[in-house]
UniProtKB/Swiss-Prot annotation:
<dbReference type="InterPro" id="IPR018268">
    <property type="entry name" value="Ribosomal_uS10_CS"/>
</dbReference>
<comment type="similarity">
    <text>Belongs to the universal ribosomal protein uS10 family.</text>
</comment>
<keyword id="KW-0689">Ribosomal protein</keyword>
<dbReference type="InterPro" id="IPR036838">
    <property type="entry name" value="Ribosomal_uS10_dom_sf"/>
</dbReference>
<protein>
    <recommendedName>
        <fullName>Small ribosomal subunit protein uS10</fullName>
    </recommendedName>
</protein>
<dbReference type="GO" id="GO:0003735">
    <property type="term" value="F:structural constituent of ribosome"/>
</dbReference>
<comment type="subunit">
    <text>Part of the 30S ribosomal subunit.</text>
</comment>
<dbReference type="GO" id="GO:0005840">
    <property type="term" value="C:ribosome"/>
</dbReference>
<dbReference type="InterPro" id="IPR027486">
    <property type="entry name" value="Ribosomal_uS10_dom"/>
</dbReference>
<dbReference type="Pfam" id="PF00338">
    <property type="entry name" value="Ribosomal_S10"/>
</dbReference>
<dbReference type="GO" id="GO:1990904">
    <property type="term" value="C:ribonucleoprotein complex"/>
</dbReference>
<comment type="function">
    <text>Involved in the binding of tRNA to the ribosomes.</text>
</comment>
<dbReference type="GO" id="GO:0000049">
    <property type="term" value="F:tRNA binding"/>
</dbReference>
<keyword id="KW-0687">Ribonucleoprotein</keyword>
<dbReference type="InterPro" id="IPR001848">
    <property type="entry name" value="Ribosomal_uS10"/>
</dbReference>
<dbReference type="GO" id="GO:0006412">
    <property type="term" value="P:translation"/>
</dbReference>
Length: 102
C-alpha cells in the first residue's frame, strides 16, 4: 500500500471513551509498523435545546440542555497489510463512531 494514507475520523459524546479508543488505534498502528499523525482534536460541536419548564404557563421559565460531540482525526501514513488487518479486527467502545477514508 505504498503512497496511501488512511484517514480515521472518530466521534463520540464522551471524550474519555473517545480518547481511549484513539489510544488503542494509535498503539495498534504503531505496533504493526505504520507511522501515525495525530490524534488531532477537531472542534467540539455543541447543540443546545431550550424548552419550557412548565407544560403551558410561565414562558420566562426555561431550561437548556446541550449535546456535545467530540471529534478526533488520525492519519496513518504508509500502512502495511498487517496494519489494515489489525485495524479491521480492532474492537472499539460502543459509543464511538468511526469513519475511515483511504
Amino acid at each position: 500500500m505504498n503512497g496511501q494514507n488512511i484517514r480515521i475520523r472518530l466521534k463520540a459524546f464522551d471524550h474519555r471513551v473517545l480518547d481511549a479508543s484513539t489510544k488503542e488505534i494509535v498503539s495498534t498502528a504503531k505496533r504493526t509498523g505504520a507511522n501515525v499523525r495525530g490524534p488531532i482534536p477537531l472542534p467540539t460541536r455543541i447543540e443546545k435545546f431550550t424548552v419550557n419548564r412548565s407544560p403551558h404557563v410561565d414562558k420566562k421559565s426555561r431550561e437548556q440542555f446541550e449535546m456535545r460531540t467530540h471529534k478526533r482525526l488520525l492519519d496513518i501514513v504508509d500502512p502495511t497489510p498487517q496494519t489494515v488487518d489489525a485495524l479491521m479486527k480492532l474492537d472499539l467502545a460502543a459509543g464511538v463512531d468511526v469513519e475511515i477514508k483511504l
